[in-house]
């Protein structure tokens, strides 16, 4: 295989971990990186790697083969010809041009095609985290300053990340003598070969801890409840996210903290609708206001403003209130509020109102026959007339 994966490192367990330890580590990590719960970049791939590692280490036969050959497939996992392949893998098949030969080269040189394998003792950035923040409609528009608290894996305060008991220090690994790698014999397509792999005692660090820290038990990390100040920018929308650098989990080997991604969940407004920086509001308008025109007060998120309604305004007419929408992110001004009027037809008229409308109809040259009463009323009148 082109890249040798350290499944023990993926699950964060030692090579002599029992089945229960492996199962607990898998459950913890799969919950943490599940794509439905963690939308941070790289979380989905991490989840796949965790599942792959567990599928191998939870199966006694696959684990034994992996421990012996570095592959769950046994010796054929290192460039051996599969059935019906005539002894060669596909040339130029997206693996750097040498197909299965990259797998064999990796046994000698620690990487595909002789490339260098990643140094397991090198500093690595910690995992990213995600935090969902609920906002009201108005908070999303105007922004706010707040504090949030969440659980994360931090550098152990007792040993400062060394994993060693205070007053002691890690010592040179007795197995790899500080190199981080050991030579092992593996069966390949060319027979038994000596190859290099990450030391199973020190995990590639070149150091081993004789006396472990009583707080973190040698991991160098501990769980903490972390609280930080957050400035929510004005104009955020539902589903948008903001990155806070190095507010995630602690790195390994002295690497930096990961990042925290805050995902905003904005509650809908009972009055307004929003699309980007534009805010929409629908208001009722009486028949008289629409016909004669009027000057009315209209609510906006910035406060009430005057709006002139021209005479003869039709239902569904839209008016634009400049600068009364939501702020545009990155300081590009403020959007507008779009007001749509709905002309209301009166449902219940008194005699005076009916008379006025009849006069209006006559003045307009309309011959209107009012439809009075309900169907039940008209039926009653018909029976009365027949007596």
Swiss-Prot record:
It is found in: Cytoplasm. Transmembrane segments: none annotated. CDD domains: DnaJ, DnaJ_C, DnaJ_zf. GO terms for cellular component: cytoplasm. It holds the Pfam family DnaJ_CXXCXGXG. Homodimer. NCBIfam families: DnaJ_bact, PRK10767.1, PRK14276.1. One of its GO terms (molecular function) is unfolded protein binding. A zinc finger (CR-type) spans 143-225. Zn(2+) 1 binds at residues 156, 159, 213, 216. InterPro entries: DnaJ (IPR012724), DnaJ_C (IPR002939), DnaJ_domain (IPR001623), DnaJ_domain_CS (IPR018253), HSP40/DnaJ_pept-bd (IPR008971), HSP_DnaJ_Cys-rich_dom (IPR001305), HSP_DnaJ_Cys-rich_dom_sf (IPR036410), J_dom_sf (IPR036869). Residues 6-70 form the J domain. The keyword Lyase does not apply. Its main location: cytoplasm. CXXCXGXG motif repeats lie at residues 156-163, 173-180, 199-206, 213-220. Zn(2+) 2 binds at residues 173, 176, 199, 202. GO terms for biological process: chaperone cofactor-dependent protein refolding; DNA replication; protein refolding; response to heat. The J domain is necessary and sufficient to stimulate DnaK ATPase activity. Zinc center 1 plays an important role in the autonomous, DnaK-independent chaperone activity of DnaJ. Zinc center 2 is essential for interaction with DnaK and for DnaJ activity. Keywords: Chaperone, Cytoplasm, DNA replication, Metal-binding, Repeat, Stress response, Zinc, Zinc-finger. The lineage of its organism: Bacteria, Bacillati, Bacillota, Bacilli, Lactobacillales. It comes from Lacticaseibacillus paracasei (strain ATCC 334 / BCRC 17002 / CCUG 31169 / CIP 107868 / KCTC 3260 / NRRL B-441). This is Chaperone protein DnaJ.
